């Protein structure tokens, strides 16, 4: 009797489990294949100016080559190639005569080498917007490059050189698009600004910040800001076979710390039990071994995966459409790669270590510099508290060299700027899915937070996996086709921005 009862209970439990499992699978599949996505149905305006003549294609390629040949390198906040920066200002005046002579455009130089343009629109009731790019580039030691990094050499359909992807492509693209539109007699309805900073790679304090101060003094407010950032990624996101456009709606914050240990000096023949180097090495080792907490789901990164859920291959599409269940698993998977780990947490990077001058002298001081890139859900103070609690050694002194909190998350639902950007991406890049993302690096746009709540970071280029490492790396390059599309993007964006409304959202469902 007892055995029979237990068998009956066991059968009931098994049946309940199987029913629950079937229900769970049904819920997962229904959400996966019917999850609605809010999209806006744009009607492409065929009357817009978009096509480029063969002569214009050659002009824009030569314009970029010439820009690359000017080595506008930012070495540090104290050292820039100011001769090259001055030369670059002269160069763009020569290459874009319509931009610098049009009665619609006001131009001024700020901070010595940065450029601010105002393009006057016909409708003063429309809030202006801002296009940003930067003139300066990071250093490019010629060793291991296939071509000299400042040659602007063309090879196999690609233009090589430092700045072809970051960010002279956008500088030339913006100015060239405006030049072509002016030649065609185009007069914008909505006013807009163009800001070209000269020190983005070293903080933007003398360039972009001066532009912001100028606009604030005039009481300017902006509908949106578009700066460099994410891109159309082709084969970069594992599990998605089609190109995907990611628009940065925020960027991580940053804290740079000096960790210092001071001890008595001595001779290596009579070493103490602990030295400044040993104490500091133990401290930075604790920081590396104890990563900052995984913050997946507390910032906009989850939004990105949900937006793209229907684009993932099976079975990843089920996981992405059901993050209410699978987010703990996904967050652990994302930790496994440095590129995706940077999305889910504040990263810790030991960048400089200084100690000692002689092999037989125990140094009194050891210093390490550590850079943290802050997840959007954390603040500078929270990170400093975690660092203190992780090191747990009063002999290690902390000093903040520079810091700023993560940028506010810009809207991607009812924002005019986001949907103009989305529309332009669809027009130019043949309709890839568009999703919000997080910029793990920093841009000049961070200085503009008091002028608008809509800041977007998107570079209008298609990047394959092998292209990503070229940015700030070896053999940076861009194809001639890509630079043509980039110019067409800005031409289209300027014209699309003349609207004063956006279409209502429609629910795009993927039915079983």
From Swiss-Prot:
Highest taxon, organism lineage: Eukaryota
GO annotations of cellular component type: extracellular space
Binding-site positions, Zn(2+) 1: 166, 201, 472
Catalyses which reaction(s): an N-acyl-L-amino acid + H2O = an L-alpha-amino acid + a carboxylate; an N-acyl-aromatic L-alpha-amino acid + H2O = an aromatic L-alpha-amino acid + a carboxylate; N-(5Z,8Z,11Z,14Z)-eicosatetraenoyl-glycine + H2O = (5Z,8Z,11Z,14Z)-eicosatetraenoate + glycine; N-hexadecanoyl-L-phenylalanine + H2O = hexadecanoate + L-phenylalanine
InterPro entries reported in the protein's UniProt record: Bact_exopeptidase_dim_dom, Pept_M20A, Peptidase_M20, Peptidase_M20_dimer
Name of the top EC class for this enzyme: hydrolase
Annotated positions binding Zn(2+) 2: 134, 166, 227
Keywords from the named record: Glycoprotein, Hydrolase, Lipid metabolism, Lyase, Metal-binding, Protease, Secreted, Signal, Zinc
Positions annotated as glycosylated: 45, 81, 450
Entry keyword annotation includes Lipid biosynthesis: no
N-terminal signal peptide: 1-34
Protein name: N-fatty-acyl-amino acid synthase/hydrolase PM20D1
Species for this entry: Xenopus tropicalis
């Amino acid at each position: 009797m007892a055995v029979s009862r237990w068998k009956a209970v066991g059968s009931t439990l098994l049946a309940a489990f199987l029913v629950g499992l079937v229900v769970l699978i049904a819920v997962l599949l229904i959400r996966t294949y019917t999850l609605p996505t809010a999209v806006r149905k744009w009607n492409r305006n065929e009357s817009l100016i978009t096509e480029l003549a063969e002569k214009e294609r050659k002009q824009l390629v030569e314009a970029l080559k010439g820009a690359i040949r000017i080595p506008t390198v930012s070495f540090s906040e104290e050292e820039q190639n100011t001769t090259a920066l001055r030369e670059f200002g002269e160069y763009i005046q020569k290459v874009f005569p319509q931009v610098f002579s049009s009665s619609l455009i006001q131009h001024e130089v700020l901070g010595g080498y940065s450029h601010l343009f105002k393009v006057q629109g016909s409708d003063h009731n429309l809030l202006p917007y801002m296009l940003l790019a930067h003139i300066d580039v990071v250093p490019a030691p010629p060793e291991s490059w296939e071509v000299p990094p400042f040659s602007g050499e063309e090879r196999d359909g690609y233009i090589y050189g430092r700045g072809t992807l970051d960010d002279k492509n956008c500088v030339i693209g913006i100015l060239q698009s405006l030049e072509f539109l002016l030649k065609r007699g185009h007069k914008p309805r909505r006013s807009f600004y163009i800001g070209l900073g000269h020190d983005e790679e070293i903080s933007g304090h003398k360039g972009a910040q001066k532009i912001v101060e100028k606009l604030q003094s005039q009481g300017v407010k902006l509908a949106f800001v578009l700066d460099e950032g994410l891109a159309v990624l082709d084969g970069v996101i594992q599990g998605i076979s089609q190109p995907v456009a990611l628009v940065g709606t925020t960027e991580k914050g940053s804290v740079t710390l000096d960790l210092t240990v001071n001890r008595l000096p001595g001779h290596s023949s009579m070493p103490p039990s602990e030295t400044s180097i040993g104490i500091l090495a133990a401290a930075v080792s604790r920081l590396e071994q104890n990563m900052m907490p995984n913050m997946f789901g507390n910032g906009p990164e989850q939004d990105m995966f949900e937006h793209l859920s229907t684009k993932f291959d099976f079975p990843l599409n089920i996981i992405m459409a059901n993050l209410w269940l699978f987010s703990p698993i996904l967050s652990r998977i994302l930790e496994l790669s440095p590129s995706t780990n940077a999305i889910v947490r504040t990263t810790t990077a030991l960048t400089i270590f200084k100690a000692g001058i002689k092999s037989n002298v125990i140094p009194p001081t050891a210093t390490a510099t550590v850079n943290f890139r802050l997840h959007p859900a954390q603040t500078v103070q929270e990170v400093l508290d975690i660092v203190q609690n992780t090191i747990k050694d009063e002999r290690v002194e902390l000093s903040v060299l520079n810091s700023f909190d993560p940028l506010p998350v810009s809207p991607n639902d009812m924002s005019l700027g986001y949907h103009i950007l989305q529309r332009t991406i669809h027009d130019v890049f043949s309709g890839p899915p568009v999703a919000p993302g997080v910029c793990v690096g920093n841009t000049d746009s961070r200085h503009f937070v008091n002028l608008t709540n809509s800041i977007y970071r998107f570079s209008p280029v298609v990047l394959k996996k092998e292209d990503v490492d070229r940015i700030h790396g070896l053999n940076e390059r861009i194809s001639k086709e890509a630079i043509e599309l980039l110019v067409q993007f800005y031409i289209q964006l300027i014209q699309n921005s003349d609207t004063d409304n956006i279409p209502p959202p429609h629910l795009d469902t993927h039915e079983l």
